[in-house]
Amino acid sequence: MKWYEVRVSTTDEASDAVSEMLTTMGAGGVAIKDPFDIKKEILKPNSLDYADDEFLESLGEDVVIQAYFQSGNDIDKLLKQINEGLVNISQFLNIGKGLEGYNEVDDEDWSTAWKKYYKPLQLTDRIVIKPTWEDYSPNADEIVIQMDPGMAFGTGTHETTQMCSILLDKYMKDDTEVLDIGCGTGILSIIAAKLGAKQVEAIDIDEVAVKVARENIELNQEITKVSARKAVLSDLKAEEHKYDIIVANIIANVIIDLSSQIPYYLKKESLFITSGIIKERKQEVIDACEKNGMSRIETLEMGEWVAMVFKCPDTL
């Protein structure tokens, strides 16, 4: 079988959104080469990797995303859809150079191309993400999440996912009921379940994303705790069910739009954990949530990104 290797040159801030878009368009796998991550890893004080200044400079500034689609796809139509998706993302984030082109590669080349990029990743102090084929011996207190590269494993490295994971780990209790808005690959829903959530409901507006999330949920043996479906928040009946934690790793515009609805779906004294917010939009999100009766209790920042926790003192 042959594959189309589609290359997109983007920015660190837009890489997660772009890789998620390519996955939902049907990519068999997505490889992300982020010079910022490479530099960060190499420059750690305890890193065993060595690189001279010339190599570090050669990495450049662009995040290169390679997405692999089966060659049976209409490539012209696919490229048009990708360009349209990039235009949509560019309304909220700086996407950089954008679509650079494609190559046709053999099945063997494809497998060589993506496997080398996927290794076990320490997402937080005790949460590890690993590709399905990699062996990993966890420590006693570590939680291991399995992700298949065809399901955009690379997106778990993004700062917004890391911060949401840290906050879920901090605030999760054994009897917690969680709603994951804009679940994407389902990674946060699975993490919530592994951390002891009683029940997790995952929703997304994209049907392909929901399919991917369901596959990931099954892969991690959490189908009894986690359900995923195509829906928007208003499809859920607030009078029938409320949640202890709502998590939303989405863009600032959507968070602001949802801020008036969130309190209706939270139990009294419950939490709204949100990220996907660039620093420049932080205050807008704070203002919107506080206007709707929520109070900010914690803020995390990584790179250009912000995550926040809001408490809802009363249910509506």
From Swiss-Prot:
Any single GO BP term = methylation
Compartments it resides in: Cytoplasm
Q: What is its main location?
A: cytoplasm
One Pfam family cited in the UniProt record for this chain: PrmA
Write down the chemical reaction(s) this protein catalyses: L-lysyl-[protein] + 3 S-adenosyl-L-methionine = N(6),N(6),N(6)-trimethyl-L-lysyl-[protein] + 3 S-adenosyl-L-homocysteine + 3 H(+)
Instruction: List the InterPro entries.
Output: Ribosomal_L11_MeTrfase_PrmA (IPR050078), Ribosomal_PrmA_MeTrfase (IPR004498), SAM-dependent_MTases_sf (IPR029063)
Annotated residues that bind S-adenosyl-L-methionine are located at T161, G182, D204, N249
EC number annotated for this UniProt entry: 2.1.1.-
Q: Which GO terms describe its molecular function?
A: protein-lysine N-methyltransferase activity
Q: What are the alphabetically sorted keywords of the record?
A: Cytoplasm, Methyltransferase, S-adenosyl-L-methionine, Transferase
| Cited function | Methylates ribosomal protein L11.
- State the family it belongs to: Belongs to the methyltransferase superfamily. PrmA family.
Sorted alphabetically, which NCBIfam families does this protein's record hold?
prmA
Q: What is this protein called?
A: Ribosomal protein L11 methyltransferase
Q: What is the lineage of its organism?
A: Bacteria, Bacillati, Bacillota, Clostridia, Eubacteriales
Q: Which gene encodes it?
A: prmA
